Amino acid sequence: MAELTTIARPYAKAAFDFAIEHNAVDNWAEMLTFAALVSENETMQPLLNGALANTKLAALFINVCGEQINKQGQNLIKVMAENGRLSVLPTVSKLFSDFRNEWAKEVEANVVSATELSLEQQQHISVSLEKRLARKVKLNCSTDTALIAGAIIQVGDLVIDGSVRGKLSRLSDTLQS
């Protein structure tokens, strides 16, 4: 994973810098997300890892993407194909999204709760995180009944485990030591 990130970072940074310069950050985010989906397609995977000539691969990839990718996006695809890097497009898209969120002072928070959260609870969590992190927060909520009760909130490297399962696990660790 670290190697993919190292390979993808220069492409993501170049795309992000270009998008900032041309006031097209959201457009580039959409293009890269779409291109990443195309590259992850099971039909496309063998071609990305196969012996197809890089120029033909770039042309095929651009043809598949159609009008979803503009001229500058096509140029990025061509450069990545020439360097044999189209397979890292999902990582490029993720890094671009990270750069965008940092630039816009936004973060994504993954909230896993034992039961579905009401809109009021989601808003309370969002407001609390915004105060703590000094950033705009976008919640991604899901449920996991194995938590028993409570929730686990993850924002980047920060993990807040307020679940009963987590508390029981910590109690068990304490008793065993």
Curated annotation (Swiss-Prot):
GO CC, sorted alphabetically, is: plasma membrane; proton-transporting ATP synthase complex
In the UniProt record, does the keyword Cell membrane occur? yes
Q: Where in the cell is it found?
A: Cell inner membrane
Q: Which domain of life is it from?
A: Bacteria
Q: Which Pfam family, any one of them, does this sequence belong to?
A: OSCP
How is this protein situated with respect to the membrane? Peripheral membrane protein
Alphabetized, the UniProt keywords read: ATP synthesis, Cell inner membrane, Cell membrane, CF(1), Hydrogen ion transport, Ion transport, Membrane, Transport
Q: Which GO terms describe its molecular function?
A: proton-transporting ATP synthase activity, rotational mechanism
Which coarse location class applies to the principal site listed for this UniProt protein?
A: membrane
**InterPro entries associated with the record:** ATP_synth_OSCP/delta_N_sf, ATPase_OSCP/d_CS, ATPase_OSCP/dsu
> How does it associate, per the subunit comment?
F-type ATPases have 2 components, F(1) - the catalytic core - and F(0) - the membrane proton channel. F(1) has five subunits: alpha(3), beta(3), gamma(1), delta(1), epsilon(1). F(0) has three main subunits: a(1), b(2) and c(10-14). The alpha and beta chains form an alternating ring which encloses part of the gamma chain. F(1) is attached to F(0) by a central stalk formed by the gamma and epsilon chains, while a peripheral stalk is formed by the delta and b chains.
UniProt lists the family membership as follows: Belongs to the ATPase delta chain family.
Role summary: F(1)F(0) ATP synthase produces ATP from ADP in the presence of a proton or sodium gradient. F-type ATPases consist of two structural domains, F(1) containing the extramembraneous catalytic core and F(0) containing the membrane proton channel, linked together by a central stalk and a peripheral stalk. During catalysis, ATP synthesis in the catalytic domain of F(1) is coupled via a rotary mechanism of the central stalk subunits to proton translocation. This protein is part of the stalk that links CF(0) to CF(1). It either transmits conformational changes from CF(0) to CF(1) or is implicated in proton conduction.
Write down what this protein is called.
ATP synthase subunit delta
Species name for this entry? Shewanella sp. (strain W3-18-1)
Which taxonomic lineage is given here? Bacteria, Pseudomonadati, Pseudomonadota, Gammaproteobacteria, Alteromonadales
Gene encoding this polypeptide?
A: atpH
